[in-house]
Every structure is written in C-alpha cells, then in structure tokens.
Amino acid sequence: MAFLKKSLFLVLFLGMVSLSICEEEKREEENEQEDDEQSEEKRGMFTNMLKGIGKLAGQAALGAVKTLAGEQ
C-alpha cells in the first residue's frame, strides 16, 4: 500500500511540475505576442508618419516650383 501511495504522489508531483512548465511557456509566448503586436503598431505609426512627412515635403516642393514658375 505504501508503494502505491509513493507512486501516486510521484505521478501527481510530476504532473504538477509538467503543468507548471507548460503554463510558464504559455505566458512567455503570450508576452512575445504582445511585444510583436506593439512593435507592429510602432512600425505602422512610423510608416504613417513617414508618409505624412513625404506628402508635406512634396506639397512644399510643388508650391516652390509653382512660385518659381509664376515669377518667370
């Protein structure tokens, strides 16, 4: 009977350790996904900012060309 108790406790202990390791890995994966999502958002914001800057620069250049063309 004592052998069965020890075996049962060993199985339960190993199961709990395995479950704990799986939960830890799951948390790490979730954190990595959150980090990936945040970096994608930053990348998207940076891209939009560059597009806006490019648009403003293009408009300024076009305005300068129109001004120069109007003076001649």
From Swiss-Prot:
Keyword annotations of the record: Amidation, Amphibian defense peptide, Antibiotic, Antimicrobial, Cleavage on pair of basic residues, Secreted, Signal
Task: State the name under which the record lists this protein.
Answer: Dermaseptin-A4
Q: Which residues form the propeptide?
A: 23-41, 71-72
What is the species listed in this Swiss-Prot or TrEMBL entry?
Agalychnis annae
Signal peptide positions are 1-22
Give an example GO cellular component term for this record. Answer: extracellular region
- What biological process terms from GO does the record include? defense response to bacterium
Cross-referenced InterPro entries: Dermaseptin_dom (IPR022731), Frog_antimicrobial_propeptide (IPR004275), FSAP (IPR016322)
